[in-house]
Amino acid sequence: MPPMISFRHFSAAPWSSSSLSTSKSSRIFLAKLFLGFCLVISQITTACGDDETHPTLDSIRSSLIRQEDTIVFGLIERAKYPTNTPLYNNTSSRFPGTLFEYFVKRSEALQSKVGRYLSPEEHPFFPDDLPPPLFEPKSQSIEQFLHPISLNVSHEIWDIYLEKLLPLLAKKGDDENYAVTASSDLQLLQALSRRIHCGKIVAEVKFRDNPDKYKEAIRGQDRDALMKLVTFEAVEEKVKKRVAKKARVFGRQVTLEHTDNATETYKVDPPLVSRVYEDWVMPLTKKVEIEYLLRRLDD
């Protein structure tokens, strides 16, 4: 049986003001959460392309390249902490599910109120019973650009992250810094989800650029044909090389002494970052593209 969670950071009630005020870890968590909400506000109407009304493949690719920075930095941030498995495995009578699930549900509920999920590329991991936003978006042009299809692969992203990526990214151990660990997890998960769900916009742009080429495969529900149409191997190779290079640049250990490149160490392994894109990010993005296209001609 795994060890029980230490609730020394959450005495009395997990979110009581008295417990939070005495916990350095919790104060850090609140500061990061507040910053996250500020970022949410700035991204509410941000689509995957620079031009929300008429995104192009070039504008979308520019956005995806910028999102690489967020994901690489997110991987570096999460790699700072050990696996902290009690965060994901143990439950308590104080809340349903694991501590991480509780953290994500409460965070998503608050982020829903400030409008995070008004953007078509933003999808919650726990969509049930989310509160409505406190305001209406100024513009929904990107939603009008897309075909009205409900598509969400967040659960698949969640499972891959916890079961496959996290064991490769974090060293084994438990430092009991569950608040900051959960915060870095959620920021990385949301960055991955946003990038992957941009596949809907990518698919729509590709369809509009050459509808006749896609319609035949869509009418025949031919997944293999659609996979060939949405796959650009040369582009994918560039992406893998670029994110690995970013991991080397962003994750370099900076010292005042001269360091031999052969012995240089990084905060996150560059080949792992490349693998994240090769094994999970790009395949899931193409899955979103194909699922979207298969229903593109539906009334």
Stretches with model-predicted labels:
Residues M1-L33:
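N-terminal chloroplast transit peptides
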Residues A31-S42:
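Cleavable N-terminal signal peptides of Sec/SRP-targeted secreted and luminal proteins
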Residues I41-D299:
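Extended amphipathic alpha-helical regions
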